[in-house]
Amino acid sequence: MGIASEVFGDALPVAERYAAFLGTAGVERGLIGPREVDRLWERHLINCAVVSAAVPPDARVVDIGSGAGLPGIVLAIVRPDLRITLLEPLLRRTTFLTECVEMLDLGNVEVLRARAEEVAGRLSMDVATARAVAPLERLAKWALPLLRPGGELLALKGERAAAELDEAGPVLKQHGVRGTELLQVGRGMVDPPTTLVRVIAGGGEDGGRRRRAPRRAKGSRKRSS
C-alpha cells in the first residue's frame, strides 16, 4: 500500500472504495475474476494509474470498452483534471460503471452505452484509452475516428505490444496516423512496467487544441508512421 499511497496521493481513500467494490460486486457480476481479488492493486489499479503519466493535462479522454472501469475510472480518480467518457456497449457493465461513478462521486466522468462505431463522428477526444479490448489492428479502427486531429490512442498492451504495432501497420497507414510510439510507464511501481502503444491521429493541424505534451516516459521508443 506504500506504492498505492505514492501513486494516488490524497485520492487513495477513493481508490480504496473502488477496489472494495471491484472485489465484491465486480466479482459477483463477472467483471473481475475471483483470482484477481488478491492482486487488484498491483495488476489492475496501480497498473492503470501509472498511465496518467502519458496523458496531457485537462484532456478529454474516452475509455473504449471500459468494462469494470479499467483504466477509465482509475484515471478519473488519480487525475481530476481529466474529463472522461466511459464507452461500453453492454448494459450490465454500464450499470456497474454508473454505480461506481455515483458511489465515488466522480464529477469528471460520464458513462455512455454504445459501441465505438456508433459514436464515430460524434466524439472528438484528445485521448482514447483501451485495455484488453482487441488487437491493435482492430482497436485502431474503432479508436481513431473518435479522436481530434493530433489526438492520441493509448493502448495498454503486454509482451506482444511491438508485434501488434507491426501487424497494425497497414491499418495505421490507411488512417493516416502521424506516428507511433512504444512506452513503458510505472517503472519501479509495477513489475513489469505498464506497456503502452501510443498512436497519434492524423488530420488537420491539431483541431485548434494545442496542449503541453507530457514528459516522455522513460524507456519509450518512437517510430515514424
Region spans (language model):
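Class I SAM-dependent transferase core
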Residues: 1-62, 77-78, 92-109
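Flexible, active-site-adjacent loop/turn segments at secondary-structure boundaries
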Residues: 29-30, 38-39, 68, 131-134, ...
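Residue-level recognition of conserved structural "scaffold" positions that shape functional pockets
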Residues: 37, 72-74, 165
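Conserved beta-strand/loop positions that form the S-adenosyl-L-methionine
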Residues: 64-66
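Conserved SAM-binding loop of SAM-dependent methyltransferases across substrates and taxa
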Residues: 68-81
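S-adenosylmethionine
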Residues: 79-225
